[in-house]
């Protein structure tokens, strides 16, 4: 963000380059330095669990420009999102052609603006803001899904271009299948309907069966090539063409995961993906943020890690509302058969995603195709009065604001690579208290003081570094003059003379913030054991918290970190910009 560098790698994106290089050698292995912990390990060999399509794309890119090895993540993700926007714009245009109530001016306005709403007012904004190894595969999978939907619906709307649409369908199916398996589900389910519709159209025009078969040979060959490559990819990793994954070979035990899919997860998934809660709102501009997933039945989900989401009812309301109306309309009103089939196929995909053992923002992108088809139905049958168009415009602007700002805020808290100039400007907008704390030139920071010699606890406390020895970093600032601490640790300082208050910023480490039910508390005590401050932290509030406390009359401050509830493996937290401020 803010650097405008198109050719730039992101987290583990180089793993696709590694896979591409090894594919030329006839193997699906990946260098462990490239994939790190996001890997399968089978008989001492390292593999990735992501689809190989981004690696196939890199075969071409690294051949053309080998000097940019490892730098394609951003370009690849941007290309996938751009092609998704193109497909969506064409879907909207095709749907509006069926609606005689829409003026040519309104049709042009919707066709041109809808791709921007999809890109910036849905989870795609989050994917493109962090084009890491996870998001790149998801972006290409979603891209393929949208193009298969376009080809499917155009068989009914533009039957004269059916041969072209069949080729698009076949290529897009391959992109889906080789990017992310679940994104290929709609195309796989629609495939029989698409081929039957094509044969029927050809038969109605009197085409001979042999000629029809010859025309189908190209799309069938493309589909077959994709399937064969995926089966080889399975065999190369697991020794079986039927094994698409094996979580027993993953870096944490499968016993933490439970079953892969369960209907009992649907209520929790619906609440996290679509529910409204005050957790998504903050008191400072832009007033929205992502929130850590909450589960009523946490035993059904991954126990070792949780991520953050923002409700689609906020971040994509322009799509959710008319998409749901269009889907419901198709249940009892006349509707194109392929549109109904597409709704059923994408609904099945969405249900599978919501029955999975993990909920996160990138998976929300797989819910988008269902609402896209519903929106196409809505635009093709409803009279679009000025009020509807105004509502679409307002909700699109609102969704873009929520999606973009929440993605930026998440990137900042995650210390994502953002240009220093942009970081500084955003900090004063999103976190003014913290920006002011970092800039405080009159304070005495604890890292400038020498701890009292007999005060440190046996547990580790690291000035200016976290517990893994890395420099403390917060919102792009590094170093931030703080303490990396583990539960059970404490450290004491002599309070400088003429000190009025102690100020600090508390935050769970990234590892602790993702754990289930992490609950830690920073406490400060004076030389008499009296409580000076108490700042609790838990995994439901993963953002930094600024606090202060008076230390007037005290000569010594002991800072400690402890578990507030039952002890867990996630027990690391940091104090940033910990400082004593003088009397005014």
Each model region followed by its residue ranges:
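Gly-Asp-aromatic-enriched flexible segments
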Residues: 432-584
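Membrane-proximal envelope and lipid/glycan-remodeling enzymes
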Residues: 1-440
